[in-house]
Amino acid sequence: FEVRNNRLDQVFFGILLERSSEGIVSGNIITSKAKSQSTSGNGVHIWKSEEITVKNNEVIGLRDGIYLEFVNNSEIINNLCKDNLRYGLHFMFSDHDLYKGNIFENNGAGVAVMYSKFIDMQDNQFRKNWGSASYGLLLKEINDSELKNNIFEDNTIAISADNTNRIDYIENEFRNNGYAIRIRGAVYDNNFKRNNFLYNSFDVAYTGRLNNNKFSNNYWSGYSGYDLNRDGIGDVPFRPVTLFSYLVNKTPEAIVLLRSTFIDLLDFSEKVSPIFTPADLIDAQPQMKKIQW
């Protein structure tokens, strides 16, 4: 079946699919002017379905732009989800899915992927998701997945990871975010490789003392090391977790000291002799130049 090239204005729910398979939702424009989450619905709402393709749609001004629950082997491609009250895209209990080439901009809390596995996230843009409880991408209890070639720009928190394991973060760009990556509890065996971290207030915030996540060959705009043999790799490891990010996690009011000379001295002392931050959370091969892919 196909739901194609429709315009739906001032709707509560836009398109609702239940117990469906082998369908295409394409080229639709769905808009509303939702004022509160309790009085609004979702643009594209899919429940207990499989092999659904949602592509080239615009969903603006609803509660969730696209919502999937118990939806497997499906694709979310080249959609624009903007100005939605809660999430631009909301995954729950959905496995073996791809979302690629989407733009998620100025949504209440960005994108949430929860209680899922084998999710492929490629070439998406997460932009301008600002707020005290906002982020570009929330990962909660998601395993065995990959994020590649995504851009995170101007978000309060670009990625918030909680109880996520065996995730590969490859060749993504984190630009001008409050936090680039905020790692909560029970986050293990993740691999961060060849990403660009550009001018974020905090590149990595980490709440625990134990770490077995790997950072390698990333570019960090805050790296001040040297490359004597000119192989493009810094000769001194980079520690992305600062003491100040640890203090802000413990005492949020400390954020008023951001970029003060006193904080710079604290961060330097923690790099020399780590006490509060994980000593083994380092990038041993930081890149000297921004990575192109």
Name what the model sees in each region:
Residues 130-136, 167-171, 175-293:
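Functionally critical loop-and-helix segments that line ligand-binding/catalytic clefts
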Residues 8, 18, 30, 50, ...:
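Sequence signature of WD/YWTD-type beta-propeller architectures
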Residues 1, 6-7, 11, 29-32:
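Alpha-solenoid helical-repeat scaffolds
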Residues 10-17, 37-47, 61-67, 83-90, ...:
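Extracellular beta-strand/beta-solenoid scaffold signature
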Residues 20, 33, 116, 200, ...:
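Flexible loop residues that form catalytic
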Residues 3, 12-15, 19-20, 25, ...:
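Parallel beta-helix/beta-solenoid
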